[in-house]
């Protein structure tokens, strides 16, 4: 999917990816917010695309993320750039479901990060504010 989009862009003389495309393999995890849930019994490949900002990057990134997020059960890497996609908070709530609720409950009960120093604005909106309306 990513390679196809890169090749299509090149045919139109657009080069949104100007550094690397890396892969990372993950096994299943019981961590509540891991991108590979514990019920998955296969190795999962995550793709990371690194690019210096250029005139074609934003459109490429948004198009690719929309395609990836359309895959049932897909879970984006928490540290990547997808915060501006419409409906992303709802998507995250859906795919993480009960795990997200459990994470928030434990976070509150154990008083983890009471000053929210480990939250960026997107995570603060998603985890603390009304997550359904965050970034819709």
PLM regions: where:
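Activity-critical C-terminal alpha-helical subdomain
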Residues: 56-60, 66-136
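C-terminal substrate-recognition/cap domain of FAD-linked oxidoreductases
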Residues: 1-59
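Short amphipathic C-terminal alpha-helix that caps PH/PH-like domains
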Residues: 2-5, 64-68
């Amino acid at each position: 999917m990513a390679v196809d989009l890169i090749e299509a862009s090149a045919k139109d003389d657009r080069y949104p990816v100007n550094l690397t495309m890396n892969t990372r393999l993950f096994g299943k995890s019981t961590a509540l917010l891991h991108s590979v849930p514990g019920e998955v019994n296969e190795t999962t490949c995550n793709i990371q695309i690194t690019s210096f900002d250029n005139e074609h990057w934003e459109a490429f990134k948004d198009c690719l993320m929309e395609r990836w997020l359309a895959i049932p059960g897909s879970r984006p890497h928490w540290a990547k750039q997808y915060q501006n996609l419409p409906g992303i908070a709802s998507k995250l709530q859906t795919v993480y479901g009960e795990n997200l609720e459990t994470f928030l409950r434990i976070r509150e009960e154990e008083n983890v990060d009471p000053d929210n120093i480990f939250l960026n604005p997107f995570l603060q909106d998603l985890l603390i504010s009304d997550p359904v309306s965050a970034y819709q």
